[in-house]
């Protein structure tokens, strides 16, 4: 291998975001502000509002990025615009010095715009994240399709803003269609544009094809007469229609025009050029919309600019519509200009747009890759429900621009892509990729890189992995090159024009971290790239023995490591801060991030790498971040791996691991959970934060302080109180028993109920920090609206059920953690850390893991680390295999361990069984692989329930861990029990364990009383089915079938029952008992009122008198 890992240095991975936002601040914002009308008429006589957009001022906000995240606020800049209210003595449109009576000028706040942080993200309402968009480029497109045995040709003009204009040709002639309106004749269209016959004759090259269909179109016009004036206005009004600079450049190029880029509407020359192109278009090849020539990137700067345009239009409309002024009120600029229109437009984009999303901060690689994502969805883009396979497929023009490997595996496959490692975006939004110039077969590496768009690639371009000598000359006489971005041709080496700059130029950052990538199947490489982004930062991370060389740049460009801004000498180092004294004698303090939660609840923590007295250079990494070691990306651990079966524990991708990983905390990670509560105003009164909680023992409140908040540093378990909170009770909240006790004995139940914040189920850990956002109230520490956040740090060790993976898509779930003394061991006594299934390699075709595993073993024995670029065949055939065999030989010789390399079975070693000490029959492949712990922890997913909430409609247990739901027993599980004939188990599962309401209560009573479990009744889901069938108009009758008596079992009796009205006797008895309880309660209440008692006695006496009177009358 050659010594220099890269032919040229990689560009900054986050430069695209920063440059786009800088363009917005310097040019985009001022352009949109200058588009405002300088003088606006107000709905008050002789009053004008004058704006000064050239003099706008940006003022920084009062918060920092860290405070903005903690306080759920926005980190941004405020825009102030000078505005002047002019009182005139006459009704003129433009005020002059003569007719001015008074001027009031002041700077007005018109809105706030989020500011990009140093890591390339935005913080809006405490959340950070966004995504770039790839859309169809505005301009002219030709399409031909076969429809109803006819060729239908269309030329479409796509605008940056406004309607689409289509020119169509069919068997009846030439037509024009605006948006999806009815088509109109091309002659009517020209007439609507006020173009006369002379201009048509002089402007068009040939008019004969149009005249051929004129009579037919005039006949068809009688039945087709849309509102022509309104349609024409759609493409002529500059306020609603704009081609944009890109659309104008595209139109000029396609039509051979030279119209200024400042003209953003269609001119007469454009119309004539389009018609001429249309008439001769059938000789052209239809445009490919998936070609990157016809697609461009809308980076964040352009997206925010378009939102500002919407906001400023709303602001102008808002000023014009203001009518709430009386004649006596003195109007000031700040009363006319409102900041809400712009603020709401910006908030819409960051909060509810398809391009705005929650930033993936699982590790620093996932954050970097997230910022380089390109989405084809969103406003103006594709619809995920109606996307063709061609739109998702890899296009030849994506070479070196978009990664062909890294994309989501779900419904967004191919629609969300990632920028390639060397790609950059030019000022027009087109993706460029760099090349070296080649002259007479020599690569001119000393000359600057040449960046080309897909449009400019009309030359012969060679890939980076072709063979070359030490002087930079191409070795082979003939080379396979790309020509015009699509065709592959064999070219003499002296006729090659350009060559790619690096082997990893075509792939993304995540994919380029996979060593021996060329030996993996593309599907597994995709999984490997995606799973690296899911790796959890470990407590003790280690750099990979086998890497690709860009690990340090990924860590550096993420800005999650602390970097020295100036050279100097370290004066002070602690876990919280590093002080460096620079050459000028100034002391620079670098604050370190300590145990802060990320968006995915992983731990963001920095560790110092320098010591007092050390000399520091500019750009040196002085503190490691999460998932880094010594300034390099370190997401996992180097483990000793054996590929062998072990008693079925690694069947179907299951993985067997040693308990040494837990003992040495190799896969231990910290996760920080956030629990929050808020003081609210309820219907019954205001909630109170307190340590005095009713019906809660002192033992359960011992960890709370005097205010009722948990103390920092305490270890908490599920159900423990974090914040004591009580809520006033209402009359409705009281139980009938409590009301009865109160009525008879005067016993008072507490007027407050416990609504404390408790530790959720499945979470235990140490209280790390508490954030209190107070809204004080007279006499109270915490008023309504006060928030309290408790952060709990949970240490997560490796356990059965956790998901781990390599970098080649080889993933699996831990099936058993075996004592390290029972694991197979090497001849030198080293026990194996992890056992993988050898059947997982040939079918998945990810042989790269075998190369990595063996080179890692050689590196571990030689105490060396390797940086291997993919596609190494440029140096020698089978270069990877030759390198690994050579390094294993060197390790065996240097360490005096001949068993490390065997000529008969290279890479295989004869292992011994840790339980018996006996050697296995066959040699086993053993090596050192880099293994990651993924963010699919069994601790977050495992769940069990005995009783809990039920669905209101079906009366079945709800689903999901978050709702404390049950495990779904679906139809396939039912089939399994039916196959075994487990009738009683099945009946129990489908009735009393599911939705038999009466049966559930009866079973509970029988278990408490020690009685036999009764038979189940009809489940609620059957009743729901009956109601649904009745709703469809079906009259369904149900019968209860029974024998006439025990002796005569041949005679059956069918009794009709109504399930909707008649319930079991137990339910009726329950209803009767509830009615009796209500009667007793009513009597108890009446006992309190003497007047009611008297009236009751009177009523009884009257009843008795009437009864005796009737009896005497009967006797007579």
From Swiss-Prot:
What keywords sit in the KW lines? Chloroplast, DNA-directed RNA polymerase, Nucleotidyltransferase, Plastid, Transcription, Transferase
Provide the catalytic activity annotation.
RNA(n) + a ribonucleoside 5'-triphosphate = RNA(n+1) + diphosphate
**Predominant subcellular localization, coarse grouping:** plastid
- Gene Ontology CC terms: chloroplast; DNA-directed RNA polymerase complex; mitochondrion
Q: How does it assemble?
A: In plastids the minimal PEP RNA polymerase catalytic core is composed of four subunits: alpha, beta, beta', and beta''. When a (nuclear-encoded) sigma factor is associated with the core the holoenzyme is formed, which can initiate transcription.
Q: Which Pfam families match?
A: RNA_pol_Rpb2_2, RNA_pol_Rpb2_3, RNA_pol_Rpb2_45, RNA_pol_Rpb2_6, RNA_pol_Rpb2_7
Name this polypeptide is given: DNA-directed RNA polymerase subunit beta
Known InterPro entries for this protein?
DNA-dir_RNA_pol_bsu_ext_1_sf, DNA-dir_RNA_pol_bsu_external_1, DNA-dir_RNA_pol_su2, DNA-dir_RNAP_su2_dom, DNA-dir_RNAP_su2_hyb_sf, RNA_pol_bsu_bac, RNA_pol_bsu_CS, RNA_pol_Rpb2_2
The answer to keyword Secreted applying to this record is no
Q: Which domain of life is it from?
A: Eukaryota
What is the protein's known function? DNA-dependent RNA polymerase catalyzes the transcription of DNA into RNA using the four ribonucleoside triphosphates as substrates.
| The organism of origin for this protein | Heterosigma akashiwo (Chromophytic alga)
